[in-house]
Amino acid sequence: MLEPIAYDIGRLCKEEDKELTPKLIDIDVIGLSQEKIFYGIMTPFRCPNSKSIYELRKSYVKADGIKMPFDTFRELTSIFKKSFIGTVKYKGNVFKYQILNFGKHVDLIELEDADLYIIADGRRLIERKELQIIPKIREKISPNSAIYSPAVFPWEIPLLAYIGVDYFDDSLAKLYASMGYKFTKNRAVKVDSFSFEELYNNNKKVYEEILEEVRIAIKNGFLRNVVEETAVSHPYLWANYRRYEPDLRNIPLSKENKIIVTTNINIPEVKKYLERLDNYEPYSNIIVLLPCSSKKPYSISQSHQKFIKAIKSAKVVVEEVILTSPYGLVPRALERLVNYDIPVTGEWSFEEIELINNCLKNFLKKVKEKFDDYIVIAHLPEHYLEILELDDIVITSKGNPTSEEALKNLTDTLKKYKELTKSKDINKKGQRIHNIQQLAEFQFGINFIPNEIFINHKGQIFTKINNKNQQIASINPKNGLLILTLSGGELLWNSGGKDINYIEVNYEIKKGSLFPPGFVDCNENISYNDEVVLIKDDTFLGIGRALMSGFEMKKAKHGALVNIRNVKS
């Protein structure tokens, strides 16, 4: 029914005629219009009582069986029909739908193999913790199947799209217009100076505008911010937003567009980063702690240019570590992977202090495991120093890290500890190779980069294979990740086998797209937009980019799974 084309926790899909979802549904389910679905299968339902609405309810209840009231006692659920199955013709195709009618007893749901799932009690679920059944449904069904949640308010759409809903309706536009309410992006406002038609047209327009914004947000990677903007005005939405634990495979490892950090510190992109940060191995036993900067990557900011120059003047190889919220700790080697904006007040929350100190303690534990002796130099402003829970540190910042006095102090201090690195085989060339290897470890879960490599000014990485210099990867200037070449993909496959991002196929592939008929298996931990290798009978064939997570690929029935970039001849 749908073909996913972009993910940002929520998903952007296209129908067969190229129309994009999330959108207002225009499918005539069981011969009922949107209005009839609202007043029919949605009943009993809390909405304003009036004779006209009662008559609509009574006349539209035509589904085969009695709908289970939301708060039905569990002992009485057996007398109600919990699922309605049928088919519907849409744009020349016949689709199977399932109306899910389980009341508050979400554990009773039994999913059929369908193209469209209709949440009969969505209006009640959205105000309760049971709303989390929707992502659980999404987890079990094909990515080509759609979820429809009837009778939602416009400001509920971003959250519902975020957790996996594809179709909505604007049935509440007419109902609330008839009661004198004007919809805005965030609420319904009682007004007296508008006619029913004016209110109705306005309310319908708000639905369309919200849906358009959601589609744009998914495509450009800022859906979470749209969700927060609308959810924060409604406690029930905010509660369900905070409850939801999204599948991190449905976001890319690094985004080209800036992540906007608001009040919610537990954002998916940060969680994904922190999970992989644990695998980072430090290179030097001289650790220099630095503050973050508003400009990203940090190294192009004026302040970090000064820090880098001061460190270079000391002619000492150090491990530069940036302390920041919400990422906690960012080694210089990984700085291009974090691109964010956060409001700076000069004050830290308890959660931020705890995160930074935990990250730092874990990092220093690894330093100690690798090197018996090490030193931590804090070149930080006062409001950073106040939160550090470290005993043995050398402070060089003298109040203002960018002042000439502080920068000279940093250089002189580093010179004093130069002897620490002499017996450790630490040098600048080795650090550059180490940084690429740690990037590979972070991105692929394995270091497949040889110790003998050459990196040119374009970020292209070469090594000798069969006595020939061959490019194995390049650094993507937009997101800081590695882009594989054929040689690099084969090296990755030979290094990690099926522990890495592999896609198994059943035919001799060509450049283009991989579709489900040619798909055999994959690593289900592949994330959307990941670099992948393609194999057949354990033989390397080519490289590409994942268009959905590996978990979703295994359930897909149609649509492109992988963009095949290059194939071994």
From Swiss-Prot:
GO terms for biological process: archaeosine-tRNA biosynthetic process; tRNA modification; tRNA wobble guanine modification. It catalyses: 7-cyano-7-carbaguanosine(15) in tRNA + L-glutamine + H2O = archaeosine(15) in tRNA + L-glutamate. Its EC number is 2.6.1.97. Pfam families: DUF5591, PUA. Residues 495-569 form the PUA domain. It is an enzyme of class 2 (transferase). SUPFAM superfamilies: Pre-PUA domain, PUA domain-like, tRNA-guanine transglycosylase, Uracil-DNA glycosylase-like. Belongs to the archaeosine synthase type 1 family. Homodimer. Is responsible for the final step in the biosynthesis of archaeosine, a modified nucleoside present in the dihydrouridine loop (D-loop) of archaeal tRNA. Catalyzes the conversion of 7-cyano-7-deazaguanine (preQ0)-modified tRNA to archaeosine-tRNA, transforming a nitrile group to a formamidine group. Can use either glutamine, asparagine or ammonium as amino donor. This is Archaeosine synthase.
